């Protein structure tokens, strides 16, 4: 009886869309899916960063990029939007100490050839990010959520940057692996938080989600919808082919 009560308590209610994605790897209604508007990064993220820069709380941007398709997955428009926003406030002495910090996370490194050294990959990632218009990086992390590589070090660094009351925004192109990474961060903390829906279909996350438990109680982490990028390889695959891609 006690076991049944515990199992019932641990169950998490999900919407029909997430249930379909988790269990069948497909959306429930493709017609309705096509009507969902693209995520407005400039309005919903960049403007918030500008407003929060004047507060006492730190702002951290975790940009997740699939290193297997780095140039295709790098959110250039968002990077340029951040660069423009940060350039506009960096000379303001009142808020320069709380300048948003950008951490770049190159995911799925386990899928690269073994002869690609971490040092060489780190330099290449920084070079490509700068060429794509990214602001100054606080640090680059090479991780694999699937193989549990680099996740603990990333979590420690994010906590240090965010402090006790900071805001952490996890951004990236559609299907870059943001939700998978956040689930691994939660696992590192030994948390029983609601698992974010993971699926090979681009655009799984629809709105900004606050993730509790990973950071200190008064700090906040947000998962954001995947950014649409015209050069994504995944956008050239049909539904059956997308299911064959490792998240």
What does each model-identified segment do?
Residues 86-174, 183-199:
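Canonical P-loop GTPase G-domain recognition
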Residues 178:
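Conserved lysine of the Walker
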Residues 11-14, 74, 121, 150, ...:
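Helical mechanochemical/support elements of P-loop NTPase systems and associated helical scaffolds
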Residues 1-60, 89-101, 196-247:
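Helix-rich effector regions associated with P-loop NTPase G domains
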Residues 66, 163, 212-215:
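Loop/turn segments within WD40 beta-propeller blades
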Residues 23-29, 35, 56-79, 103, ...:
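Conserved Switch II/interswitch segment of TRAFAC-class P-loop GTPases
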Residues 40-44, 74-86, 117-125:
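Well-ordered, non-membrane alpha-helical segments in soluble/globular domains
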Residues 28-30, 74-78, 116-119, 154-156, ...:
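Short coil/turn segments at secondary-structure boundaries
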């Amino acid at each position: 009886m006690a076991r049944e009560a515990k199992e019932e308590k641990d169950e998490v209610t999900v919407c029909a869309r997430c249930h379909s994605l988790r269990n069948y790897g497909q959306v429930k209604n493709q017609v309705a899916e096509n009507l969902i508007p693209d995520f407005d990064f400039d309005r919903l993220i960049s403007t918030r960063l500008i407003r929060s820069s004047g507060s006492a709380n730190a702002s951290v941007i975790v940009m997740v990029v699939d290193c297997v398709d780095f140039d295709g997955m790098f959110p250039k428009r968002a990077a340029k939007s951040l660069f423009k926003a940060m350039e506009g406030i960096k000379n303001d002495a009142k808020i320069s100490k709380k300048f948003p910090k950008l951490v770049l996370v190159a995911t799925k490194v386990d899928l690269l050839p073994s002869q690609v050294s971490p040092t060489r990959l780190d330099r290449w990632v920084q070079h490509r990010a700068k060429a794509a218009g990214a602001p100054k990086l606080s640090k680059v992390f090479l991780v694999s959520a699937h193989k549990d590589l680099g996740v603990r070090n990333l979590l420690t660094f994010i906590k240090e940057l965010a402090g006790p009351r900071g805001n952490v925004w996890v951004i990236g192109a559609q299907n870059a692996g943001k939700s998978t990474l956040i689930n691994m961060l939660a696992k590192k903390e030994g948390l029983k938080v609601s698992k974010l829906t993971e699926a090979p279909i681009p655009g799984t996350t629809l709105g900004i989600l606050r993730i509790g438990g990973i950071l200190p109680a008064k700090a906040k982490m947000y998962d954001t919808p995947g950014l649409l990028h015209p050069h994504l390889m995944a956008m050239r695959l049909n539904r059956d082919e997308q299911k064959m891609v490792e998240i």
